[in-house]
Amino acid sequence: MRDADGRQFDVEIQQDTEGASPKRARYHSGWMDRNTLNAGQDFDELLETHVIFITRDDVLGYGLPIYHIGRKIEEVGADFQDESHIIYVNSGRQDDTELGRLMQDFHCKDADSIHSEILAKRVYELKETQEGVDFMCREMDEIYKEGAKRGKTEGIAEGIAAGEL
């Protein structure tokens, strides 16, 4: 998905620690780049990308609620500024901060229990109105189709890399 400024986002919600490994984050970041440009297009046209893993537990293990991963020029400690960002959010950390309350909201099943009025209203619309239920069914169908397409593409790429195709 893209925002109004053209930044591209891939939000991955991971229940299992194995699904949120650093190399998987790198893979998703590279996948976004590969799907941004056409052959012959200038590399300066690459979009700013954000891969966001929302995880059930603190998969990086430093006890923080959020981790911003970026590349650095090691010799001088400067940011590399390739506009590629990876963020890990520990949804298990549900303290009384803005992020902590948002993580609490993500775990709520009932719109009445959600702190954010905007999110509560949208959850109510999606879960408790016929229009919302219809919309969610269409969205789930699209997500399924996109996942199947992505899986097929990844499988072909892996088969080619392994010399099996």
Where are these regions (language model features)?
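Accessory alpha/beta interaction modules
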Residues: M1-H85, D95-T97, R150
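Short, charged alpha-helical interaction segments and adjacent helix-coil junctions
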Residues: R2, F9-Q14, Q94, L99-L165
